[in-house]
Design a protein with these regions (language model features):
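An active-site-proximal beta-strand-loop segment
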Residues: 26-53, 60-64
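C-terminal domain-tail junction helix/linker
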Residues: 138-181
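Short, conserved catalytic/metal-binding motifs centered on acidic residues
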Residues: 32, 50, 84-87, 112, ...
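RNase H-like two-metal-ion nuclease catalytic core shared by retroviral integrases
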Residues: 86-88, 98-141, 175-178
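Short, solvent-exposed loop/turn segments at secondary-structure boundaries
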Residues: 56-58, 95-100
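Active-site beta-loop-alpha junctions of metal-dependent nucleic acid enzymes
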Residues: 37, 55-83
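Basic, flexible linker segments flanking DNA-binding modules
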Residues: 1-30, 103, 172-180
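Short, active-site-adjacent cap segments at secondary-structure transitions
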Residues: 90-93
Length: 181
């Protein structure tokens, strides 16, 4: 039709949010660190079910502690994920480049490569990529304010076995995890 303007490709509307999750449990695990009350919390969470695979509270957020939890998760659940997704924190990702401009490889990345696990990272300043972790830490911190004496292990048990999730069709992470093995 003549006289009408053409749409400008550069001015497209905001992209619609799309929820993603792998169709089976143990394909991708998310991991991250968060500080709360001068302690560092590290968690590995299954992408499909949102089940906490391993958790720990430490004095410092280190690669060694993250690897300890990864091995703990694999041994306790007798499974090795295909992919690990994390942010670009120094515990996981080599943020330095050598003199030739090549990105270094972190101890965490080397260990995953040795185990045959792919390592994916979120974009910088884009917490939505690892949103399941961000949401989990938010839930933990809110609950800890109400349940002061609850240990991390008690919280994880409640989260995995009792707390239903809207995104999981009102099932618990444990139920969804068992369905999708």
């Amino acid at each position: 039709i003549s006289g009408l303007t053409e749409p400008c490709e550069k001015r497209r509307g905001q992209r619609k949010y799309v929820r993603y999750q792998w169709p089976i449990s143990n394909y991708m695990w998310h991991c991250d660190w968060s500080e709360y009350k001068q302690r560092w919390y590290c968690v590995f969470i299954d992408d499909r079910s949102r089940k906490i695979m391993a958790d720990g509270v430490f004095g410092n957020a280190t690669t060694k502690n993250a690897l300890f939890l990864l091995y703990q998760a694999m041994l306790a659940n007798e499974v090795c994920p295909v992919i690990i997704l994390s942010d670009k924190g120094a515990q996981f990702y080599a943020n330095k480049y050598d003199k030739s401009g090549e990105k270094g490889i972190s101890v965490f990345e080397e260990e995953l490569t040795g185990l045959g696990i792919e390592f994916w990272t979120s974009r910088r300043n884009h917490p939505q990529t690892n949103g399941k972790m961000e949401k989990w830490f938010d839930t933990m911190k809110k609950r800890k304010k109400k349940h002061l004496d609850e240990t991390l292990q008690e919280f994880v048990k409640w989260y995995n076995e009792e707390r239903i999730h809207h995104a999981l069709e009102y099932k618990t992470p444990e139920e969804v995890y068992r369905e999708n093995l």
